[in-house]
Amino acid sequence: MSVLIVTSLGDIVIDLHSDKCPLTCKNFLKLCKIKYYNGCLFHTVQKDFTAQTGDPTGTGAGGDSIYKFLYGEQARFYKDEIHLDLKHSKTGTVAMASGGENLNASQFYFTLRDDLDYLDGKHTVFGQIAEGFDTLTRINEAYVDPKNRPYKNIRIKHTHILDDPFDDPPQLAEMMPDASPEGKPKEEVKDDVRLEDDWVPMDEELGAQELEEVIREKAAHSSAVVLESIGDIPEAEVKPPDNVLFVCKLNPVTEDEDLHTIFSRFGTVVSADVIRDFKTGDSLCYAFIEFENKESCEQAYFKMDNALIDDRRIHVDFSQSVSKLWSQFRQKDSQKGKGNGCFKCGSTDHIAKDCVGGPSSKFIVKDQNRQHGGGEGYEMVFEGDVHETPKHNSHERERSEKIQRRSPHGNGEGKRQHRDERDDGRRQHDREDARELERKHRERKERESREDEDRRRRRRREESRDKESRRERDEDDHRSHRDYKERRRERDDRHGREARHERRDR
């Protein structure tokens, strides 16, 4: 009376005590025959104590006996078959994991060490492992969480009955599947934080070159995600355009038109931009050449590398910049967020930042003459005032001319002198205002420049920290993989030695 249990870590052969525990052995054999245990997890592994399985839900709270399937819900559990001569004295003892007195169903456990005598008299012992102690050792050494659930799932793959002394009930034939089920049981509670039983470490599955490539791809993706989060690129998966060349080592005197003329012999050049310092306007000695199609770009790449332009040997490569794509992305995003047009003038062919027009101003110049007051010469008006202002100004001018004609001193020399002095004072005031505006503008530019430099410095520091953290994570991953392989190698060597000793002892 034996059963072969195939697990994800190896095979186990169990000899059953069918003469002393007929109810339990019949229940176990018939559940194996209907493939009830296929896919069941070892949901509880307590090192040097027990390994429990037999629950299709994988929680330790489920499971039914064969008698429930044969006779109904009232027969879900059956009574204990405890014998004093069947003890937990040896490693590999097989017993029922009952929920209490006479509450046996489908769950059972293996003992993982000798002399667990305090379990005697509490659980039904119905078998003993005959072969597969190395598999039992692997189960015992599994890494588990604080609830004794293995981090990597250990499953029963198949069960094969080697000897069955009990006759099959008539209803059993209807319960037997046509083929042995594979995978997870339908009743299993989903748990996404576990490694599946067929998972293998990446360094064991891939070669050294493939593993390095995978790690490099992950690092590149992480960098792209960081750049996306800080706003340097529109999305992590963005790719640079394939029709743009990067040209460096240029002579500072080389102009955009020169590059446009030189590279035009390979195809239509859409743009040739020499990058310049935003303050001084001096060339930074590199440029971007955009072609109309990819073929022209590739031809220029092969022909122009190390070419001589203005006494300089230039270097040509495919552009990795996504600046233009990022600008287009932001422009589309701005249009999408603002109604596909300019909110200033209402036009749909441009956005607000490119608008040079706009609605009629709410502020207009009422009078340039400071003797009438008005501070800066601007007053608040309403919509209707904008169209009435010219007529109002003409009336004011006529009234002023009449007053001057009636005045006895209207054309006097003193009047003219006073007006000249007033004009000189106004011009001096305007020059001071212009200098003040220029000073404020210069200060604002300097402040913006400092802020831009601070942002670039912070971005470089963040990228450096991210790069260092990725390098440390990669080193930790390599170290953990090496440790894991070393532990597995030591464990396999120990299992081999123990198996040889056992065969020698027999």
Curated annotation (Swiss-Prot):
GO terms for cellular component: nucleus. It is an enzyme of class 5 (isomerase). A zinc finger (CCHC-type) spans 341-357. Coiled coil: none annotated. Residues 1-161 form the PPIase cyclophilin-type domain. Its EC number is 5.2.1.8. Residues 243-321 form the RRM domain. GO terms for molecular function: peptidyl-prolyl cis-trans isomerase activity; RNA binding; zinc ion binding. Disulfide bonds: none annotated. Component of the BZR1 complex. Interacts with NRPB1 (via CTD domain), SCL28, SCL30, SCL30A, SCL33, SC35, SR30, SR34, RSZ21, RS2Z33, RS31 and RS40. Belongs to the cyclophilin-type PPIase family. This is Peptidyl-prolyl cis-trans isomerase CYP59. The gene is CYP59.
